[in-house]
């Protein structure tokens, strides 16, 4: 996440690994902003690995996708036995409080949660 916003062509990658028995809360400083695209796709890939007995609270602020943005986000969570993950991905299409709507563009979101090579979600 960058507080300044994401534009077409940006590639963000985040890999977080919790050690056994760790307890962590991760959030963001502000809402994520995905601005109008220059015809290139912006992409964010997040991979969370939670070791045995660890607990991760993944609670970023919402992502605002502006009109004419082209954006894809992928989230993968890998849980060891006894690991706990609590999380969300909140997406707002346009800034509705300002009367702005998402009328054109593309937004794709993909979330996977795995434990011991078995998909849970």
Model segments located where?
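Conserved beta-strand/loop scaffold segments within soluble protein domains that form the structured core
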Residues: 1-121
């Amino acid at each position: 996440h960058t507080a300044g916003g994401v534009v077409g062509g940006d590639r963000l990658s985040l890999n977080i690994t919790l050690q056994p028995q760790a307890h962590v809360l991760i959030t963001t400083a502000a809402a994520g902003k995905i601005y109008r695209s220059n015809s290139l796709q912006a992409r964010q890939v997040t991979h969370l690995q939670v070791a045995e007995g660890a607990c991760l609270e993944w609670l970023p602020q919402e992502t605002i996708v502006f009109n004419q943005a082209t954006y894809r986000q992928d989230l993968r969570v890998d849980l060891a036995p006894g690991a706990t993950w609590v999380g969300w991905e909140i997406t707002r299409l346009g800034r509705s409080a300002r009367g702005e709507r998402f009328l054109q563009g593309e937004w794709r979101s993909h979330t996977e949660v795995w434990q011991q090579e078995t998909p849970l979600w």
